[in-house]
């Protein structure tokens, strides 16, 4: 009888682990990851551009991921993303230059200049309004 109870508890723990993994943003992102060099090229191109700045260990970044994915998919947007937690992307001078001191942050660039930003966790409707407001995609 004890074996059945232990087996049952192990199965419950496994099911909970799988649920947590699936519900915490394991879905494939609809944004395109870039590095610091590509970020600079995107800004310098002077074309209208949305760039999402995040960290993989940031809880609000994990929370916003499904919301952002939903809007990108629905609106058929092209969004670049920079994970500043990756060693190659962490540069304090760069972060200071672009005033990137909070994640998640979605930036809108036009003519090589930042025109708007959305910082912190936001709902899908708030994200959609941000993209619509900066609509020349």
From Swiss-Prot:
Residues 1-25 form the signal peptide. InterPro entries: Thioredoxin-like_sf, Thioredoxin_domain. Keywords: Disulfide bond, Oxidoreductase, Redox-active center, Secreted, Signal. GO terms for molecular function: protein-disulfide reductase activity. Residues 26-136 form the Thioredoxin domain. The keyword Lipid metabolism does not apply. GO terms for cellular component: cytoplasm; cytosol; extracellular region. PROSITE patterns: THIOREDOXIN_2 (PS51352). Unknown; dispensable for production of the lantibiotic sublancin 168 and for competence for DNA uptake. Belongs to the thioredoxin family. This is SPbeta prophage-derived disulfide bond formation protein A. It comes from Bacillus subtilis (strain 168).
């Amino acid at each position: 009888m004890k074996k059945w109870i232990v087996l049952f508890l192990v199965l419950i723990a496994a099911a909970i682990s799988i649920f947590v993994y699936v519900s915490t943003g394991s879905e494939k992102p609809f944004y395109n990851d870039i590095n610091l060099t590509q970020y600079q090229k995107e800004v310098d191109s002077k074309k209208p551009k949305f760039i999402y700045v995040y960290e993989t260990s940031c809880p609000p970044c994990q929370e916003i991921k499904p919301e952002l994915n939903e809007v990108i998919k629905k609106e058929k947007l092209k969004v670049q993303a920079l994970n500043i937690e990756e060693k190659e992307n962490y540069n304090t001078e760069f972060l200071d230059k672009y005033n990137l001191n909070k994640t998640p942050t979605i930036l809108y660039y036009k003519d090589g200049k930042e025109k708007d930003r959305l910082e912190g966790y936001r709902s899908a409707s708030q994200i959609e309004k941000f993209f619509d407001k900066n609509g020349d995609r």
